[in-house]
A protein has these predicted regions:
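C-terminal beta-rich recognition modules with glycine/proline-rich loops and embedded aromatic residues
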Residues: 235, 297, 363-371, 376-463, ...
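Short, surface-exposed beta-strand/strand-loop-strand elements in extracellular ectodomains
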Residues: 163, 485-493, 498-504, 736-754
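Short, hydrophobic/aromatic-enriched beta-strand segments in well-ordered soluble domains
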Residues: 472, 476, 527-538, 717
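Carboxylate/His-rich catalytic cores and anion/metal-binding grooves
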Residues: 113-133, 233-236, 240, 292-305
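Aromatic (Trp/Tyr) and acidic
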Residues: 23-111, 115, 146-178, 213-230, ...
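Aromatic, loop-rich ligand-recognition surfaces of beta-strand-rich domains
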Residues: 649-651, 694-761, 767-806
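Hydrophobic, small-residue-rich alpha-helical packing segments that form membrane-like cores
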Residues: 187-276
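Bacterial Sec-dependent N-terminal signal peptides
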Residues: 1-25
């Protein structure tokens, strides 16, 4: 009976959608819900099924194991104990997985999953306070997390209480749309009513923006479901309040709260927050027909797309603040490109497309979707990347879960909703934005796509049911043009692409590749077939010369898929000593047994030896999204294109063979050398040579959130060595989330054979110069452990780029 009820609910949703499509006379572009879009291809359908059968159950298990559900039980008074977890926003992890599970339930009914969601939602509802408030760490009075939320509700802008509310609302709306049940929606409405009562422009209300955005998107979704305009007004308030600092709080680039949105023209701060905020702004602007906000969004987008977008569709270059650096800071090894940020980038760009009909926004969606987003989850579906660098020395590995577990839940809800991005409608006209095999019911029309995209560019679209006069708009992807994204020159293809071809019922039509879409106006009937051929040649890409880390390098791309080279496919497992000449032919072939079935690229390359000799080698590239599915190894997207850009394999040194550690807690002044160094550290002995103290393009160590304190970093060698010199390259650069400077002073200690620490007898001064190595000679010591103890400058943090031993 429940299954029948669910199916009837979905039919109702589709019927409403069909009616809107058939009668709308305006020009607004509307999304086509994923429920009437059914994929049966060999690319997305298996991934969506793995998400349903592996990723979602795995994420729920981790929520159980990590105490996420227990926190709700504790807030409900059902159990006794301590609040678990390290973050005030841990409640959002179950919300996101519930959202993903709801999408999965709508696509394929599962009785056990349906009942499981009922039980979880019942638990969450019991944790809600009578006035609608719901943040468990506050209800549970977890003083251990008071640094986040303070001493009472709504005290701090960065408490994430509104972030919790936003994900609660989005999850509840998804569950209602999927099942027709109001159990979770009623919880969300009660919470949203409290939010709209508490925050706003009136006397007695709190005057500040959302902190971590998502409440804006969420309230817009709730408005669409309920029709209650107070939710739209609430979303509009949070958008308008951003950057105004009405309550006296400090402006913050980190939260895009540094100036009003209408005055913003550069994308800054935390990348996920930016994507969520601008998605919410786009929602409000669309629902209120506010073109001034869209003008501001276009300015910000242009800055992102022309100066801060990674070739994989990722955003956010720095681990510090999980956000953006200055223009053209697109470092590969230290690229953050958080999985959540890539998903947020899709959300924002798709909304920009809906507002404008411009394909450049879908180009960003597709680029992020096939590369950065899919890199965030293993092919097995149970391991995840938090950050997605474009280069690795083998130190990166997907994890089953994280203390800050925002990404796994986000993956589950996003992958389940991928069919949502394939089609859109404008009146009776149909946009085909993404190409994927399957059927879609849009109004009285049933379309069927047949294709092997993204491995093959041939697409057939058949009208299976229905007829009528309307336009079909077929997107011409950015990967067939001179530049991947719009007309900006951040990235440029080195050679022209072949021209796409299109035919209707076997009759060719003209295609202008400079257009966004191939638009076909006609009276359609059952059996009509559109044949589209998007030539998928391997294309080389060069980056703008201002992107320093990409100079004299090339990226390989075929269709929407960015490729990388990985150590497993090279004879010596080393990749940085290879370079690829522009004249070399690159061939593509399908490998059905590799990585679940992928296109691989093969070519001849050159290799630089340790003595400078040049050798011919074979090079294989795989889709970037599939790297690290065969174990840890080196990887790079941007391949050297000149011998000077290739790096010969360095010979091992005393330092390179050492284990590296740093102190976790504070160092006492009386005996700094004895402080425990129990936290793993990295980046200081990887043999990458810094260009300057602000060179953050390669891994480095920094003392996160430490300012003006004594900090340490230590080496533990594979055996005792006699040493008499050390060289330290200090970190120094400015960042909105923390400034890093060379230390005020430092000293070097060694551990003797009896396990006692002593300072070395230095023959030269402990210098703190920047942009160079600081070398210290000392009386030879035989030791298996060395430690630097650094006194940081007052008010500043610090770090080490590279540390050598002789």
């Amino acid at each position: 009976m429940q299954k029948r009820k669910l199916l009837l609910t979905n039919m109702l949703v589709i019927a409403i959608t069909c009616n809107a499509i058939g009668t709308t006379q305006g020009t607004r572009i509307e999304e086509v819900p994923f429920t009437p879009v059914h994929l049966n291809d060999m690319f997305w359908a298996p991934r969506i099924e793995v998400n349903r059968t592996v990723s979602i159950p795995s994420a729920f298990r981790e929520c159980e194991k990590s105490g996420r559900f227990d926190n709700f039980a504790l807030a409900a008074g059902l159990i006794e104990g301590e609040h678990q977890g390290d973050f005030s926003f841990d409640d959002t992890d179950p919300y996101k997985v519930i959202e993903g599970a709801s999408y999965a339930l709508a696509a394929k009914y599962d009785k056990a999953l349906d009942h499981y969601l009922d039980s979880v939602i019942t638990l969450i509802a019991k944790a809600q306070e009578p006035d609608g408030y719901l943040t468990t760490c506050v209800t549970n009075n977890c003083t251990r997390l008071s640094g986040w939320w303070g001493t009472h509700k709504w005290e701090r802008i960065n408490s994430h209480e509104l972030y919790n509310s936003g994900h609660l609302i989005e999850s509840a709306v998804a569950h209602y749309r999927a099942t027709g049940k109001r159990t979770f929606l009623d919880v969300a409405i009660k919470n949203a009513d409290l939010v709209c009562k508490t925050f706003g422009p009136n006397e007695g209300q709190i005057h500040r923006p959302g902190g971590h955005p998502i409440i804006e998107m969420a309230l817009c979704k709730l408005y669409k479901v309920t029709g209650n305009k107070k939710y739209l007004e609430g979303a509009k308030y949070f958008v308008e309040e951003t950057g105004r600092c009405t309550d006296g709080h400090h402006p913050s680039e980190y939260s895009q709260d540094h100036k009003p949105i209408l005055e913003q023209d550069e994308i800054v701060g935390h990348a996920v927050r930016a994507g969520y905020l601008y998605s919410g702004v786009a929602d409000v602007a669309a629902l209120t027909n506010d073109q001034e906000y869209f003008k501001a969004l276009e300015r910000i987008w242009q800055n992102m797309a022309s100066k801060k977008l990674f070739i994989t569709g990722g955003i956010g270059s720095r681990a510090q603040g999980e956000g953006f650096g200055p223009n053209y800071e697109l470092n590969n090894h230290t690229a953050y490109c958080e999985t959540c940020a890539a998903i947020a980038n899709v959300y924002w760009n798709y909304r920009m497309f809906l507002a404008t009909g411009e394909s450049k926004y879908v180009d960003v969606c597709e680029r992020a979707l096939y590369n950065n987003v899919l890199s965030g989850v293993s092919l097995s579906g149970d391991r995840f990347f938090y950050d997605n660098p474009l280069e690795s020395g083998g130190e990166h590995e997907r994890q089953k879960w994280f203390g800050c577990a925002c990404c796994p839940g986000n993956v589950t809800r996003f992958i389940a909703s991928v069919p949502n991005y394939i089609y859109a409608v404008q009146g009776r006209d149909i946009y085909v934005n993404l190409y994927a095999q399957g059927r879609a019911t849009i109004g009285n029309i049933e379309l069927e796509q047949t294709t092997e995209y993204p491995w093959d560019g041939k697409v057939s679209i058949r009208i299976n049911k229905g007829s009528g006069k309307f336009a079909v708009r077929l997107r011409i992807p950015g990967w067939l043009k001179a530049h991947p994204i719009g007309d900006n020159n951040l990235y440029t293809y080195l050679t022209p692409a072949r021209h796409p071809q299109c035919a209707i019922n076997g009759t060719a039509i003209n295609v202008d590749v400079t257009d966004d879409y191939i638009t076909i106006h006609r009276a359609w009937k059952k059996g009509d077939i559109i044949e589209l051929d998007l030539p998928m040649d391997v294309r080389r890409i060069e980056a703008n010369d201002n992107a320093e880390d990409d100079r004299n390098k090339v990226c390989l791309e075929r269709g929407p898929v960015v490729f990388c080279i990985e150590g497993q496919d090279q004879v010596d497992h080393y990749i940085f000593n290879k370079y690829l000449l522009h004249s070399t032919n690159v061939t593509a072939r399908y490998e059905p047994t590799l990585l679940g079935g992928v296109i691989v690229l093969d070519t001849q390359a050159k290799e630089v030896g340790q003595s400078g000799e040049i050798r011919d080698v074979q090079l294989r590239a795989i889709p970037y999204s599939t790297w690290n599915n065969r174990g840890n190894d080196q990887m790079e997207v941007w391949i050297a294109s000149t011998p000077t850009a290739a790096i010969a394999t360095p010979k091992p040194t005393i330092a390179s063979r050492a284990q590296t550690f740093s102190n976790r807690g504070p160092i006492q002044n009386d005996a700094p050398e004895t402080a425990p160094t129990d936290s793993w550290a990295g980046g200081t002995n990887d043999q990458w040579e810094p260009k300057r103290s602000s060179d953050t393009s390669k891994p480095y160590h920094y003392w996160w959130l430490k300012r003006g304190s004594k900090e340490s970093i230590s080496y533990k060698f594979d055996r005792p060595y006699t040493i008499s010199n050390t060289q330290v390259y200090w970190l120094e650069f400015d960042h909105y989330d923390g400034d890093f400077k060379v230390p005020q002073s430092w000293a070097l200690y060694y551990k003797d054979a009896n396990g006692q620490w002593h300072e070395v007898e230095a023959h030269s001064a402990y210098t703190t110069r920047k942009d160079c190595y600081n070398s210290v000679d000392f009386k030879p010591v035989t030791t298996q452990e060395l430690k630097i103890v650094a006194q940081l400058q007052e008010g500043y943090s610090g770090g080490v780029l590279e540390w050598k031993i002789q």
